[in-house]
């Protein structure tokens, strides 16, 4: 029998069966009218629950049979830093590719951007499944959460340029918060965001440290500006291609 990190987890199955997400899912799915424009959208709450179960089971099978067997090698090889660039271990990249091919990288994103339009509870279950297989890969997979922040607060140009690529899994993200003298106390952040009127550009000055997946393509950087603390979106050269 094929191993599955969802179906063999009684705790996750119990919560999926008993969580009452009907109100939240009804709002997410626009009263279950989204299917008229997006064929993959559920037509009812029962349909949504069936879809969630299938997604979790698919991920559970990938995690157990394709990701977990390579986790030890991922730890042993680790990330590589050469010529100023950080790269994941080859087996970590293989794990990400499996998740991309299964179309599991846009969990929280709306249908219009190619996402799965899942409630946050479902993503947390997905993160638990990946964590069981490979905690390092879980950090990369879980940080797709920042795409939901962009979907909620970004402008339209930003959304159209970035979110479909998150859903495709071709870019990754990170939250850039911690500094040498500001960890859990984010009010102590000293990095500054300075606006350059001549070039119409925001420039960041400061030091960040201990950033999970800090080599990501899309970074949300917490910095001080004249209006207080704000998150600025930084894109790598790869993300701008």
Feature-to-residue mapping (PLM):
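Conserved small/polar residues in nucleotide/adenosyl-binding loops
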Residues: 234-239
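Short coil/turn segments at secondary-structure boundaries
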Residues: 27-32, 70-80, 109-111, 139-143, ...
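Extended, charge-enriched "interface" segments that sit outside catalytic cores
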Residues: 1-82, 86
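Hydrophobic alpha-helical scaffolding
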Residues: 2-5, 45, 49-53, 81-86, ...
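Internal helix-loop-helix
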Residues: 60-61, 90-160, 164, 168-169, ...
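Long, contiguous hydrophobic alpha-helical segments, chiefly transmembrane helices and signal peptides
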Residues: 12, 16, 55-63, 67, ...
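Glycine-rich phosphate-binding loops of NTPases
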Residues: 231
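Glycine-rich, Trp-frequent "lid" loop and neighboring beta-strands that shape
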Residues: 116, 157-226
């Amino acid at each position: 029998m094929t191993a599955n990190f969802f179906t063999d987890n009684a705790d996750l199955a119990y919560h999926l069966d008993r969580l009452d997400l009907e109100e939240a899912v009804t709002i997410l799915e626009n009263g279950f009218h989204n299917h008229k424009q997006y064929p993959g959208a559920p037509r009812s709450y029962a349909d949504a629950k069936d879809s969630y179960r299938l997604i979790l089971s698919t991920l559970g099978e990938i995690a157990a049979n394709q990701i977990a067997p390579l986790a030890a090698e991922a730890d042993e090889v680790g990330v590589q830093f050469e010529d100023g660039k950080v790269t994941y271990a080859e087996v970590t990249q293989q794990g990400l590719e499996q998740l991309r091919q299964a179309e599991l990288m846009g969990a929280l994103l709306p249908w219009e951007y190619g996402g799965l339009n899942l409630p946050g509870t479902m993503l947390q279950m997905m993160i638990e499944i990946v964590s069981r297989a490979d905690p390092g890969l879980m950090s990369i997979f879980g940080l797709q959460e920042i795409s939901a922040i962009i979907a909620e607060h970004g402008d339209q140009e930003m959304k159209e340029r970035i979110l479909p690529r998150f859903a495709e899994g071709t870019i990754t993200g990170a939250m850039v918060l911690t500094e040498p003298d500001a960890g859990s106390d984010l009010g102590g952040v000293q990095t500054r965001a300075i606006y350059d009127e001549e070039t119409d550009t925001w420039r960041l000055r400061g030091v960040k440290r201990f950033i999970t997946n800090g080599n990501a393509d899309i970074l949300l950087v917490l910095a001080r500006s004249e209006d207080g603390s704000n998150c600025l979106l930084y894109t790598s050269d790869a993300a701008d291609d």
